Amino acid sequence: VVAIDGKTICGAYESEEAKLFRGTYLKPSSPKYKLHMVSAWAADNGISLGQIKTEEKSNEITAIPELLEALDIKECIITIDAMGCQKTIASKIIDKEADYVLAVKNNHMHLYKEIEHFFTIWSAEKPNRVSVYEKSETGHGRLEKRTCIACDNLYWLNAKDYTQWAGLKTFACVITERTVPGERGPRKQKETRYYISSLALDAELIASSVRKHWSVENNLHWQLDVSFNEDYGRKKNNAAVNFSLVSKTALSMLKHYESKSSIARKRKSAGWSDDVLQSILSVEKF
């Protein structure tokens, strides 16, 4: 699974427009100075495969195809959030001989409503060609149950909606139910998300792909913020892009280093001991 997701580097505040005002007392008309970085994350290997910069989050739509073009993703499963749920991106993934699982939200209202309607009535209608997968986990004092329901009968969707998506084979619903302890007793939370995919009818595989997508947030973006203080570094020009690339490379090395210590502790150990530093730089698995 290769997860594509963007992250705003808050410390990289200077945009192309802002450069024109450098050395003056004037301010750019647009407040959007921050740099936005789109990354490709190999979820199973814990490695950042590539990155491309944009100056606004909305530019992810044009940046993602460029990033995909630079990668060898043959036979991979590409997961992207709703921002990347675009026909051009789906076509690019299929052209690269890969599969996709794309989140569907209100940016494709008709498609979203049709999928939502199907999963509202499916338990009563009991349609055929449906796959269901359930899994429950406990951790951090909470119980979490995830249910994935997938259907490959695309005739439930409007023809204009599904025929324009390259390689589309299934649409799915992932329901997450959490029971979280609280001072006044357990609290229940429920979240429902919808997806389209080029994968064959396999609810377990789709559920696994969706689950792995979140590793880009937990294992990459969170680590860059907390362990490398990426958002607090004030950088200009290409420095922000270069530091982001070096930080991701260092993070991958630290993750594959055999020690069970945290990323922060591994960094300290490398700073204190040349032997540890050499061992990290010599990680063969990386």
Language-model segments: which ranges?
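Short, hinge-like loop/turn segments at secondary-structure boundaries
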Residues: 20-21, 96, 117-121
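An anionic, glycine-rich sequence signature occurring as long contiguous blocks
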Residues: 105-211
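A short, flexible helix-boundary coil/loop motif
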Residues: 223-286
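Generic secondary-structure signature for well-ordered alpha-helical cores
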Residues: 69, 98, 120, 124, ...
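Short amphipathic alpha-helical "interface-anchor" segments enriched in bulky aromatics
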Residues: 200-234
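Conserved, well-structured functional cores that handle cations and Mg-NTP chemistry
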Residues: 1-80, 85-88, 260
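Short hydrophobic alpha-helical runs that function as membrane-insertion/retention elements
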Residues: 99-104
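Short, surface-exposed basic-aromatic patches at helix termini and helix-loop junctions that form
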Residues: 90-98
